Amino acid sequence: MVSLTSYAFVSMMLFSIGAIGVIARKNIFVIYMSIEMMLNGINLFLITFARYHFNIDPQIITVMVISIAAAEAAIFLSVIILLFRSKKSLNTDVFTSLTQGEN
């Protein structure tokens, strides 16, 4: 059986890689994928905690996080499509103005 620290280390690494991706990348889609990686790291830790401490509450929270992430994915991807149609780029440097009149 794999130890609790091994799962905690993997979940910490997933979260850290996702956080670095959010901070360092300029592509909106890559930032979105990094956010999803961070959520998966959190979910892995919650499931590990539930398994080793025989508690069902973290599993319920994980199911809620997964369902919220699915709704977030639908909204975020539609926003990405609209931004790409308007600016023809997914680079965050292009999106400096919030007004519609400016290109």
From Swiss-Prot:
Q: Where is the signal peptide?
A: none
> What is the recorded function of this protein according to its Swiss-Prot or TrEMBL entry?
NDH-1 shuttles electrons from NADH, via FMN and iron-sulfur (Fe-S) centers, to quinones in the respiratory chain. The immediate electron acceptor for the enzyme in this species is believed to be ubiquinone. Couples the redox reaction to proton translocation (for every two electrons transferred, four hydrogen ions are translocated across the cytoplasmic membrane), and thus conserves the redox energy in a proton gradient.
The yes or no answer to whether the keyword Cell inner membrane is present is yes
Species this chain originates from? Aliarcobacter butzleri (strain RM4018) (Arcobacter butzleri)
How does the record describe its quaternary structure?
NDH-1 is composed of 14 different subunits. Subunits NuoA, H, J, K, L, M, N constitute the membrane sector of the complex.
UniProt record similarity statement: Belongs to the complex I subunit 4L family.
GO biological process entries:
ATP synthesis coupled electron transport
Q: Describe its membrane topology.
A: Multi-pass membrane protein
Localization per Swiss-Prot or TrEMBL: Cell inner membrane
Please state the gene responsible for encoding this protein. Answer: nuoK
Catalytic activity, EC: 7.1.1.-
Where are the bilayer-spanning segments?
A: 4-24, 28-48, 64-84
Report what the protein is called: NADH-quinone oxidoreductase subunit K
User: Disulfide connectivity?
Assistant: none
Q: What is a GO molecular function of this protein?
A: NADH:ubiquinone reductase (non-electrogenic) activity
> What InterPro entries does the record point to?
NADH_UbQ_OxRdtase_chain4L/K, NUOK/Mnh_C1-like
GO CC, sorted alphabetically, is: NADH dehydrogenase complex; plasma membrane
Traced from the root, the source organism's taxonomic lineage reads: Bacteria, Pseudomonadati, Campylobacterota, Epsilonproteobacteria, Campylobacterales
Please tell me where this protein is predominantly located: membrane
The record's catalysed reaction(s) read: a quinone + NADH + 5 H(+)(in) = a quinol + NAD(+) + 4 H(+)(out)
Group of enzyme by EC: translocase
Keyword terms, alphabetized: Cell inner membrane, Cell membrane, Membrane, NAD, Quinone, Translocase, Transmembrane, Transmembrane helix, Transport, Ubiquinone
